[in-house]
Design a protein with these regions (language model features):
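An active-site-proximal "capping" alpha-helix that borders the catalytic cofactor pocket
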Residues: 125-129, 185, 193, 208-211, ...
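Amphipathic alpha-helical transducer elements in NTP-driven molecular machines
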Residues: 117-121, 177, 181, 272, ...
Length: 357
């Protein structure tokens, strides 16, 4: 498959490409990894149940703490009996709340209309047809140096072909049409893998959920910090114990998160490698390294553009055209910065915990 550059981008596609063969062993491996990722949240739930059982056991079996105590010792005995139960209850609460709390809202995107952008929609349909992937129901724009194809309604679209394509405007502004076509072929290459993409969605969802549980903080964390500063030493001790329990619990979850990441990394790299093959087949193997370099440069320029935006925001101003600012920043990158990025790319080797080859 080749992409030339005639008058119409739709005429640029000539020939066809051979679908990348996904070995049966690889698909079976993805299933095993997905099963392991599903088991990790069950370990999380088991931790909640175990902590609940310990609190119940303490309340039922440690009533002797309150027997044969008099005077001021009653206060100490009460704290020794009630304190662990309160601390354990708070610990359980902090483990349960992530099951029901929603994550941070995704950055807003702009939905395109096929009636207003027929050429772009036809361009995407052409790529999907060549790659052998389902056509997305929606195309959206954002300001990232990236493109992504995913389930439009998350889990509700899991068993169908209800997809959404998100194209970053800096990507479109800073790349050639051939390069953009290659990037889109990479994204749709994931969905050409069928079951593999769904296994991957399970894996990434579980990994993302664990990361959110471990690192996100909310107003309950702030309240616990405040309670741990209580003036009464007894109350302070209870909430410090609870705070310590929450810290230990998050460390356990951190271990589960990294276990899931380690389990899934090899399969993730293989999926990305297969998707890369679609990009190389559609845009050309000679264009692939140029696209990768362009992505690195635009990503660095995006960081500089966001710093510019932050500075202007201090004066209650914002850039009029962020994609153009990113492209300008890329064009004016110092030679030393370009060389540094290129050297880093050539010298970096794939590590065991990398998700991309």
């Amino acid at each position: 498959m080749t992409v030339s550059t005639p008058d119409s981008p739709l005429d640029a596609f000539t020939g066809s490409i051979t679908p990348t063969r996904v070995p049966l062993l690889y698909q079976a491996g993805l299933g095993v990894v997905a099963l392991a990722m599903v088991l990790l949240p069950l370990v999380y739930i088991a931790l909640i149940v175990a902590m609940g059982w310990l609190v119940w056991w303490h309340l039922v079996n440690d009533t002797g703490i309150m027997e044969n105590v008099h005077g001021r010792a009653i206060v100490l005995a009460l704290l020794a009996y009630i304190g662990p139960a309160v601390a354990g209850g708070i610990f359980i609460l902090f483990l349960i709340k992530p099951l029901f709390s929603r994550g941070l809202k995704a950055a807003p995107t702009f939905k395109l209309s096929e009636a207003e952008e027929p050429l772009l929609f036809d361009f995407v349909k052409k790529i999907c047809g060549v790659v052998g992937a389902p056509v997305p129901r929606e195309i959206r724009l954002d300001t990232q140096v990236n493109a992504s194809a995913g389930f439009r309604r998350g889990w509700f679209s899991f068993f169908g072909n209800d997809l959404v394509l998100v194209i970053g405007l800096p990507l479109a502004a800073g790349m050639s049409m051939r390069q953009v076509a290659g990037v889109l072929a990479h994204e749709f290459g994931h969905f050409a893998q069928g079951a593999g993409m769904r296994f991957s969605y399970i894996i990434r969802s579980v990994n993302g959920w664990f990361a959110r549980v471990v690192y996100e903080r909310d107003h309950w964390d702030e309240k616990l910090d405040g309670w741990a500063q209580a003036e009464h030493w007894g109350i302070k001790a209870i909430f410090m114990l609870a705070k310590g329990g929450v810290w230990v619990g998050r460390k356990v979850l951190w271990c589960l998160m990294n276990a899931g990441h380690a389990i899934s990394c090899f399969m993730s790299r293989q999926m990305e490698f297969d998707a890369d093959s679609y990009e190389a087949k559609l845009a050309g193997s000679s264009e692939f390294p140029r696209t990768a370099e362009r992505l690195r440069l635009l990503s660095a320029a995006y960081g500089a553009a966001m710093q510019d935006a932050y500075q202007t925001y201090q004066n209650r101003e914002l850039p009029d055209d962020l994609p153009s600012l990113v492209v300008w920043r890329e064009q004016t990158l110092p030679t030393a910065a370009r060389v540094s990025l290129q050297n880093a790319a050539h010298q970096t080797k794939t590590a065991w915990n990398d998700t991309h080859p």
